[in-house]
């Protein structure tokens, strides 16, 4: 019974995470389209959109914060709990760790990049010698961090979806995993996000169904 309670708690935490991710994606899409519409078409129009752009920027930052909370505040602990029930999910928990490490490295790369431009005084002529080396270092750090986070993303979402399907036999998990894979392929041609958003919806629905089945099975007394 204790193990089943941990399992249900883990799935509920994961479900909350995918809900937060979905909301974050929607907010991000709204903000992105808002930026496109709000782009001023002349000097006189610029002043009129400053407030709108500021609002959309705040919305975008909130979406990013919500996505980070979803991954590291919900999905990461959910995978950790689930790995206590089924050790096969340990790889998914490790994936969230790689995403965290990759994010930290990317942030460090951004800091180095900002320091390089600050040292150069934003002057192209100053970007020589050691400054150029610093720029190469910053870009290298960003690339490494991005690759680590990307690998973690695959381990968490793609592998996670397929492992959930293998354990609970709900085809929606499989469908979500396939959508995640296809969207990664589309990323190579500059199109990303739509199929992943649908995958989040499928994961949310599938997790709800699994939780209901496990809860019902727990509440139903065993037949003698």
What are the roles of these predicted feature ranges?
Residues 130-136:
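Helix-boundary and loop/linker segments of multi-pass membrane transporters
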Residues 1-122, 127, 150-184, 192-224:
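Membrane-interface extramembranous regions at the lipid-water interface
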């Amino acid at each position: 019974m204790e193990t089943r309670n941990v399992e249900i708690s883990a799935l509920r935490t994961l479900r909350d995470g995918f809900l937060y991710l979905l909301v974050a994606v929607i907010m991000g899409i709204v903000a992105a389209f808002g930026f496109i519409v709000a782009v001023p078409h002349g000097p006189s129009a610029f002043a009129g959109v400053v407030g709108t752009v500021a609002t959309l920027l705040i919305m975008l930052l909130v979406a990013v914060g919500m996505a980070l909370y979803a991954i590291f505040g919900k999905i990461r602990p959910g995978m950790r709990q689930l790995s206590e029930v089924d050790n096969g999910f340990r790889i998914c928990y490790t994936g969230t760790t790689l995403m965290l490490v990759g994010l930290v490295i990317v942030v460090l790369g951004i800091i180095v990049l900002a320091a390089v431009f600050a040292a150069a005084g934003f002057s192209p002529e100053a970007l020589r010698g050691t400054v150029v080396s610093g720029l190469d270092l910053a870009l290298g750090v960003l690339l490494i961090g991005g690759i680590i986070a990307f690998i973690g993303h695959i381990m968490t979402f793609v592998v996670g979806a397929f492992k959930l399907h293998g354990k609970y036999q709900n085809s929606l998990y499989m469908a979500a995993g396939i959508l995640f894979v296809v969207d990664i392929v589309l990323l190579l041609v500059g199109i990303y996000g739509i199929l992943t958003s649908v995958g989040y919806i499928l994961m949310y629905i599938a997790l709800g169904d699994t939780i209901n089945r496990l809860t019902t099975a727990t509440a139903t007394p065993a037949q003698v």
